[in-house]
Amino acid sequence: MARIAGVNIPTNKRVIIALQYIHGIGPKKAEEICEKVSIPPERRVVDLTDAEVLQIRETIDRDYIVEGDLRREVAINIKRLMDLGCYRGLRHRRQLPVRGQRTHTNARTRKGKAKPIAGKKK
């Protein structure tokens, strides 16, 4: 197994798919990385040489924010919104949907399990 950005990527998959196992790299970025390193995307990870794996690793480290750094950056951005006291920050603080979804019904994922209310039975 090749280890890139602290993640063991699967060896039997194509490079473009295997790179997507890294948090912060999706289909488009995986394609960009393959272009930069000039590796055909349909090539398998098993067939990569150590030099090619090293090139991929260096490209990701140099050009992309991935894994822990990305998670940390997102958490800091959310914390900044909460400290500002803006609408989005308040929604995060109250653990409600942030992007304008309705909450009268639905939003159970964000709000958690429904809390029973006494005397509400019919």
Swiss-Prot record:
Listed name of the protein: Small ribosomal subunit protein uS13
Keywords: Ribonucleoprotein, Ribosomal protein, RNA-binding, rRNA-binding, tRNA-binding
Assembly with partners or alone: Part of the 30S ribosomal subunit. Forms a loose heterodimer with protein S19. Forms two bridges to the 50S subunit in the 70S ribosome.
Family matches, as SUPFAM superfamilies: S13-like H2TH domain
Any matching Pfam family: Ribosomal_S13
Record's keyword annotation contains rRNA-binding: yes
GO cellular component: cytosol; small ribosomal subunit
Domain of life: Bacteria
GO annotation (BP), single: translation
Native species: Beijerinckia indica subsp. indica (strain ATCC 9039 / DSM 1715 / NCIMB 8712)
Residue numbers spanned by region Disordered: 95-122
InterPro entries in the record: Rbsml_uS13_C, Ribosomal_uS13, Ribosomal_uS13-like_H2TH, Ribosomal_uS13_bac-type
Gene3D superfamilies according to UniProt: 1.10.8.50, 30s ribosomal protein s13, domain 2 (4.10.910.10)
Single annotated GO MF: tRNA binding
Family indicated by similarity: Belongs to the universal ribosomal protein uS13 family.
Function in brief: Located at the top of the head of the 30S subunit, it contacts several helices of the 16S rRNA. In the 70S ribosome it contacts the 23S rRNA (bridge B1a) and protein L5 of the 50S subunit (bridge B1b), connecting the 2 subunits; these bridges are implicated in subunit movement. Contacts the tRNAs in the A and P-sites.
